[in-house]
Amino acid sequence: LRRSSAASDVYKRQGELQKDDVDFFIIETMSSIDEAVNAVEALSNFNKKILICFCLSEGDGTKLFSGEDLSKACDLIQIDKISGLCLNCSQFEDISIGLDILKKYGLPFGALPNNFQSVKPLKLGMSVDNIKKRNDILIEDFVNYSNIWLKKGCTILGGCCEITPDYINGLNQFLMKNKYNKVNFFN
């Protein structure tokens, strides 16, 4: 692993600025093992719970965006310092595979998919402004995927890029209709 003092310093500074105003830290869109390890190490000394979210390689729900194994990332992040594991800003299909890996760690886990056609065109420093939204994932599809993920044991559900408030509202209506209890996943 490459420990990056520059990256660690950035995460520590962010933690220092937020620690008095937050209940817990969410570390999102971790695309490599180094990135995740540096973030967890930097934030674990603030006496706050940590939810970490990994970004998956498009087309392979077992790999991070960097190409490294998701299971190896979970093994190396000091899992005892983590309160929950998620997959975010990734394709629905990849998340469905990756959740089976997260489940093995015995922590609350979840999914926050994006609704992009593809992020493969992205290069370092580019914005997602030019990425197109998928046309094949409607609100009811989001709800159906979420139901599958609930059956896998997910306790954290939400959305990332291009998952609009209408999608979240559709999910909320489904959860209420089916009498799912909202729980604080840190209890």
Positions of the model-derived regions?
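Catalytic-face loop-and-helix region of soluble metabolic enzyme cores
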Residues: 61-62, 69-156, 174, 178-180, ...
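Aromatic/hydrophobic pocket-lining residues that form the small-molecule binding cavity
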Residues: 9-12, 36, 70, 95, ...
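Active-site-adjacent beta->alpha loops and helix N-cap segments on the catalytic face
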Residues: 30-47, 91-106, 163-171
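A structural motif
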Residues: 19-24, 30, 82, 151-154
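A cross-domain feature marking catalytic cores of carbohydrate-active enzymes
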Residues: 29, 52-56, 87-89, 113-115, ...
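Single conserved hydrophobic/aromatic residue that forms the stacking wall/gate
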Residues: 1-7, 11
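An active-site-proximal structural segment forming one wall of the substrate-binding cleft
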Residues: 9-20, 24, 142, 149
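Conserved beta-alpha-beta core of the PfkB/ribokinase-like small-molecule kinase fold
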Residues: 36, 43, 49-68, 120
